[in-house]
A protein has these predicted regions:
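Short, well-structured N-terminal submotif of metal-dependent ribonuclease cores
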Residues: 1-37, 50-62, 104, 113, ...
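Short glycine/serine/threonine-enriched helix-capping/active-site loop
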Residues: 37-38, 74
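Phosphate/NTP-binding elements of NTP-utilizing enzymes
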Residues: 45
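Short, solvent-exposed loop/turn segments at secondary-structure boundaries
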Residues: 49-51, 85-86
Length: 125
């Protein structure tokens, strides 16, 4: 299974936060699954860090690079897919994650109920 991690799922995974569901932990740690980290997630984190809404460790890049995540860039196909999404979610970061999941046929690991309304596969974070 190809998994795409939502921002909170990444943060919970990296900090070993007990908020992350057992189903998500099993899916992320399963060597049969490929776990993707979108540039959108890093972008959102860095914006929040820059405005003081998120504290990240100084070695954040090294921590992320130490994970077995495959990196997913944003492509023109992803951007074009936004127009085909129903107006369920207003958050541009989440809409782009949904577009990426649709284009790349991925399952999103998220706690966001709005994302499930798009009819895509979700592992509850």
């Amino acid at each position: 299974m190809n998994l795409l991690l939502d921002t909170h799922a990444v943060l919970w995974w990296l900090s070993d936060d007990p908020t992350l569901s057992e189903a998500a932990r099993v899916a992320i740690s399963d060597p049969e699954n490929t776990v993707y980290l979108s540039a959108v997630v890093i972008w959102e984190m860095r914006i929040k860090q820059g405005i003081g809404k998120l504290d990240l460790p100084d070695d954040f890049e090294e921590v992320v690079d130490g994970q077995a995540f495959s990196k997913l860039p944003v492509t023109v196909d992803h951007a074009n897919a936004i127009v085909r999404l129903p107006a369920i979610h207003r958050d541009p970061f989440d809409r782009m994650l949904v577009a990426q999941a649709v284009v790349e046929e991925m399952t999103i690991v998220t706690r966001d109920r709005n994302i499930a309304e798009y009819g895509i596969d979700v592992v509850v974070a």
